Amino acid sequence: WTAVVVSAAAGAPVIGAIAVAIAVGIHLWSCDTPEAEIRLLLVAATMGLAWESALVLAGLLEYSSGIWIPGLAPFWIVAMWILFATTLNVGMRWLRRSTAIAAVAGGIGGPLAFFAGASIGAVELVSPVIALISIGIGWAVMLPLLVRLAIRLDDSHRLVEQSA
């Protein structure tokens, strides 16, 4: 996270994207079922691109670096969604305990991450209060969805092995 946000704030978002590519490569190499994990990462990337672009188009966020197509979220924020998704079946596995826990974690953690990113210049919160509330609501909905998908994909290989 730090490498991506700091490099984006410094106007060199490619550095963070390279760090994400290396981390994701190592993660996939260590996975029992990389195919299922890739599906999770692709869904997270798509979800992230759509959500972050909606925030940009709504005028709530402005990014100064990494814009590939005007009106869309920068590539580095999509890379962060992919990086975050790599934690769902590992370090963030505790979110599986309940949908409410995942919703609260997303509702608090999402805005905090954006506040931190804005404080170092990676993103501008155009209307800070409205932006942070919107981000909190979005993450409170999306994190439980990502957790459920992670569970489904993580457990799918076990079902195949048991039926064989």
Which residues does each predicted region cover?
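Aromatic-rich, lipid-facing transmembrane alpha helices and their immediate juxtamembrane interface loops
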Residues: 1-164
